[in-house]
Amino acid sequence: MAQEADGIRLDQRHGKARVRVGRVWRHAHDGSHHFVEWNVSISLLSHCLSSYRLDDNSDIVATDTIKNTVYVKAKECGDRLSVEEFAILIGKHFCSFYPQVFTAIVNIIEKPWERVSIDGKPHLHGFKLGSENHTTEARVEKSGALNLTSGIGGLALLKTTQSGFERFVRDKYTILPETRERMLATEVNASWRYSYESVASIPTKGLYFSEKFMDVKKVLMDTFFGPPETGVYSPSVQRTLYLMGSAVLKRFADVSSIHLKMPNIHFLPVNLSTKENPSMVKFKDDVYLPTDEPHGSIEATLSRITSKL
């Protein structure tokens, strides 16, 4: 919300970024522990125009206070909760506790700590770090209105066949050959928006969003790879991206849109030759040079079209 004074319109926010917190929940019934590591960033939109115009900080919530609040709220959460639930909880607190705060935007990145298994048995308190992150952004209004997104960051996927690229624009700058056989590799960054429009409307089932995160991830991966025996052919990253996004929208009624960013990470064919040995290495879809730059950049947003009737 813009504020005006002295012929100037001011849009402002302040907060605390990269507040790192680890939380352990100990379960007495079986002796197991659950661990999460969160990187929390908070922005507050508030009525504090006087701090910009005058020597008056009376409406500013100190960023150190914002940081401390994250740890206090983490301590108060006696039961395990999802990263989305924690983001909403933090947002609700700032909007209700401080009269001058009308919007809280909470971004959290959850590191992928996974329980280890020893001799096939889940360890009660042992964890290893995985690859892709679980992300969320909750925008909470004082009125209770909510804009909630979840996401996956750094989901590296690769298939060694069932991919090609043909019939693209060819001109005097084009040297790329057409192919129906290539390796397809990408690092998926996805974010999807939920259709819940208020804090009161979110599901009450515990860890609902953690389960939904795993379900969305599975749909994305299943669509990318196809059946385990045969796979599925990809004529382009664009087509595969579209199929992945539309599969999520078809499967999950409470997801209103999804944004996918899928760089085309290249594995270049290796051919080596000399005068003495013209076939030192002759590429037969077997030896590649991995490279991650430059890479193709493909991204799109798919949104559900709702009837206006």
From Swiss-Prot:
Gene3D superfamilies: Urate Oxidase (3.10.270.10). It is found in: Peroxisome. One of its GO terms (molecular function) is urate oxidase activity. InterPro entries: Uricase, Uricase_CS. Urate binds at T63, D64, F165, R182, V237, Q238, N264. Pathway: Purine metabolism; urate degradation; (S)-allantoin from urate: step 1/3. The active site is at K16, T63, H266. This is Uricase. It comes from Arabidopsis thaliana. The lineage of its organism: Eukaryota, Viridiplantae, Streptophyta, Embryophyta, Tracheophyta.
